């Protein structure tokens, strides 16, 4: 299973949020470029970067910093946050980003998602963020009436190969991932699934790996040292 150390960017710094609440923000590193390089040096093989400013503004804000993180870390990166037009997708992918995550627009602008998938294939991932099973958009500020599984099935029909699923109620809480929802997704959609939210320990990563998922994202637990990079490297190499 691929494990992605997470770097969330706000005002040019690495931060962690609690349940997606921007008022509950903790700065974990003032230098995101050094953070990206540190993860890579310690064995990370793929980074997950979120432009939180971009998610709020609806356009990429931290482009320059993200490019420097990629060139410094010298490993693949996937990026999300505020990507809502083909021009933005083009810019990221043409600048060397390996995969872009279309979040809010996956729900609000399915034609854009379809066009991006047709143009770039596996370089496009869909981000589904849900609270109590209902999809949230615009930096998690708006909660829709759309069920997470229904949206995942729509994404599969569009041709999306990778879905990143975040349980907002667990994000940044260290209460463990939502194994039930991930197992439900695994059963009903045949795409690469990446779990996000709540990972608190190596045991959580192992439990996700045993579901047969493509990947998992580790954030707060890494910064709090409840998971080490050596844990990540070892879990990635075990066949569950």
Swiss-Prot record:
Pathway: Amino-acid biosynthesis; L-histidine biosynthesis; L-histidine from 5-phospho-alpha-D-ribose 1-diphosphate: step 4/9
CDD domains, sorted: HisA (cd04732)
Keyword Cytoplasm listed: yes
Gene Ontology cellular component terms for the protein in this record: cytoplasm
Reaction catalysis annotation: 1-(5-phospho-beta-D-ribosyl)-5-[(5-phospho-beta-D-ribosylamino)methylideneamino]imidazole-4-carboxamide = 5-[(5-phospho-1-deoxy-D-ribulos-1-ylimino)methylamino]-1-(5-phospho-beta-D-ribosyl)imidazole-4-carboxamide
Transmembrane regions listed in the UniProt entry: none
EC number of the protein: 5.3.1.16
Name under which the protein is recorded: 1-(5-phosphoribosyl)-5-[(5-phosphoribosylamino)methylideneamino] imidazole-4-carboxamide isomerase
Cellular compartment(s): Cytoplasm
Keyword Isomerase listed: yes
Listed GO biological process terms: L-histidine biosynthetic process; L-tryptophan biosynthetic process
């Amino acid at each position: 299973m691929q494990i992605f150390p997470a770097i969330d960017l706000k005002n040019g710094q690495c931060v962690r949020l609690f349940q997606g609440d921007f008022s509950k923000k903790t700065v974990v590193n003032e230098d995101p470029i050094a953070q990206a390089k540190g993860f890579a040096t310690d064995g990370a093989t793929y980074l997950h970067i979120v432009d939180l400013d971009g998610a709020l503004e609806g356009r990429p804000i931290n482009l320059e910093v993200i490019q420097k993180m990629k060139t410094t870390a010298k490993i693949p990166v996937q990026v999300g946050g505020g990507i809502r037009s083909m021009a933005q997708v083009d810019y990221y992918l043409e600048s060397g980003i390996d995969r872009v995550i279309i979040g809010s627009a996956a729900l609000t602008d399915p034609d854009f998602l379809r066009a991006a998938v047709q143009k770039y294939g596996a370089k496009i991932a869909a981000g589904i963020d849900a609270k109590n099973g209902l999809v949230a958009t615009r930096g998690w500020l708006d909660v829709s009436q759309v069920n997470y599984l229904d949206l995942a099935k729509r994404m599969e029909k569009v041709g999306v190969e990778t879905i990143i699923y975040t349980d907002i109620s667990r994000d940044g809480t260290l209460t463990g991932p939502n194994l039930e929802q991930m197992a439900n997704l695994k059963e009903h959609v045949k795409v690469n699934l990446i779990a996000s939210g709540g990972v608190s320990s190596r045991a959580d990563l192992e439990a996700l790996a045993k579901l047969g998922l493509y990947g998992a994202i580790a954030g707060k637990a890494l910064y709090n040292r409840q998971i080490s990079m050596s844990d990540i490297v070892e879990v990635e190499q075990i066949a569950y």
